[in-house]
Amino acid sequence: GFINTAWTYVDEPGVYRGQCTELCGVYHGYMPIVVKAVSDSEYKDFIQGKRDLKAQQALLTEKLWETDELFAIGEEVYLKNCVACHQVNGAGIPPVFPALAGSEIVMNDKGRQVEILMEGVQGAAMQSYAEQLTEVEIAAVITYTRKAWGNDAGGDGEIVVPKEILDYKNNKL
């Protein structure tokens, strides 16, 4: 999977609608676009809010996390972001969306699983979540998939903590 970005300059704040004109996957050419343009001051407030959130997330990466806490957050993240492709039971929809239940990568290759969520999979439907999810959410959803559907019994049982995701982003993993 992949994400295309484009920039434009808008004179007046408001909501603008359009149509995706680049065919980057099945039905993407039919994707409607909605853009909310805001004033400079609103944009600066938005950016400051993102900076504050990033600082808060950095503090959360230093926290000592419990497995149950990560699992609960991960389940929420999974149900919002992953379930459409990988299904509630982790069975996926092979061959397009692989099963996570019983997956050798999910059960035993934590580093590869982190890489997949951070980078996506070239030539497959799996996109990168590095910009869509926080370090806490990525660590939690990986921990969830490593512990759900019996994966904890057959795998190495390792959890992922937010600090590992931050380190990956900083090329330290």
Give residue spans per PLM region.
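Short helix/strand-bridging catalytic loops that position acidic/His residues to coordinate divalent metals
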Residues: 3-7, 97-103
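Extracytoplasmic electron-transfer domains, predominantly the class I c-type cytochrome c fold
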Residues: 99-155
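A short secondary-structure junction motif
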Residues: 50-54, 81, 88-92, 120, ...
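Non-transmembrane, membrane-proximal soluble domains of secreted or membrane proteins
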Residues: 1-72
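Extracytoplasmic/periplasmic beta-strand context in beta-sandwich domains
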Residues: 31-33, 98, 124, 163
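Flexible coil segments in periplasmic/lumen-exposed cytochrome c-class electron-transfer proteins
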Residues: 50-69, 80, 131-173
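Sequence/structural segment immediately N-terminal to covalent heme-attachment motifs in c-type
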Residues: 67-93, 101-119
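The canonical Cys-X-X-Cys-His
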Residues: 20-21, 74-88, 126, 141, ...
